[in-house]
Amino acid sequence: MAELLLGVNIDHIATLRNARGTDYPDPVQAAFIAEQAGADGITVHLREDRRHITDRDVRILRQTLHTRMNLEMAVTEEMLAIAVETRPHFCCLVPEKRQEVTTEGGLDVAGQRDKMRDACARLAAAGIQVSLFIDADEAQINAAAEVGAPFIEIHTGCYANAETDAEQAKELARIASAATLAARLGLKVNAGHGLTYHNVKAIAALPEMHELNIGHAIIGRAVMTGLKEAVAEMKRLMLEARG
């Protein structure tokens, strides 16, 4: 079973900063602490409306991170240009709606193959590894393989939001099947969205999982216990699940 990595999403450090229009807390400082605590990478979502992470954050993080930078972004000309200029280690392409609180679902790769193929090729030419944020759906996984993305990130929101044990078990089975299919097609498999200290282990135990990207739960815990301890505890739970 391959090593399981933790990508810590620090968007909500920026949310807190921007709530008062100050220059603190600084996501760059948070990234440094997360790395010290065991994060294998730092994830940020540069949204079109810049509601949390800013261009300045992206630029400085790329220059200062000791691990890997994963830039989440919409598939737009503006964002592709920023990515090509900044050259993060990874880009995760996500759907984006201005009115949403957080990303609500996966990309429709199957319905826009040409657009996704072009984006993947453009980013790959800049030396960036591409991940597509998709639902645990066979058609989307097949399409992801066809357009040339080396990674997918499975949307775990339905699993995380399940209201009953039976519903959660059903969603977990869907994710497990999706991960198996993706691996068979030669894709590396990440996962994220809604994962918490209470539900992460079942996802972490799936042998195909390469990396979990987790943000809100860690930042929420950090308010109570400190960021370093919050990151370390999440990493411990993930590794426990791998035995």
Curated annotation (Swiss-Prot):
Key word Acetylation present: no
Residues of the active site: H45 (proton acceptor), E72 (proton acceptor), H193 (proton donor)
Residues that hold 1-deoxy-D-xylulose 5-phosphate according to the record: D11, H12, R47, H52, T102
Enzyme class: transferase
GO biological process: pyridoxine biosynthetic process
Localization per Swiss-Prot or TrEMBL: Cytoplasm
Record keywords: Cytoplasm, Pyridoxine biosynthesis, Transferase
Record carries keyword Cytoplasm: yes
Catalysed reactions, semicolon-separated: 3-amino-2-oxopropyl phosphate + 1-deoxy-D-xylulose 5-phosphate = pyridoxine 5'-phosphate + phosphate + 2 H2O + H(+)
UniProt xrefs under Pfam families: PdxJ
GO molecular function: pyridoxine 5'-phosphate synthase activity
A GO CC term attached to the entry: cytosol
EC number: 2.6.99.2
Pathway field: Cofactor biosynthesis; pyridoxine 5'-phosphate biosynthesis; pyridoxine 5'-phosphate from D-erythrose 4-phosphate: step 5/5
InterPro entries: Aldolase_TIM, PyrdxlP_synth_PdxJ, Pyridoxine-5'_phos_synth
Site residues (Transition state stabilizer), renumbered to this chain: E153
Subunit structure: Homooctamer; tetramer of dimers.
Family assignment from sequence similarity: Belongs to the PNP synthase family.
Biological function: Catalyzes the complicated ring closure reaction between the two acyclic compounds 1-deoxy-D-xylulose-5-phosphate (DXP) and 3-amino-2-oxopropyl phosphate (1-amino-acetone-3-phosphate or AAP) to form pyridoxine 5'-phosphate (PNP) and inorganic phosphate.
PANTHER family: PYRIDOXINE 5'-PHOSPHATE SYNTHASE
Name of protein: Pyridoxine 5'-phosphate synthase
The organism of origin for this protein: Salmonella paratyphi A (strain ATCC 9150 / SARB42)
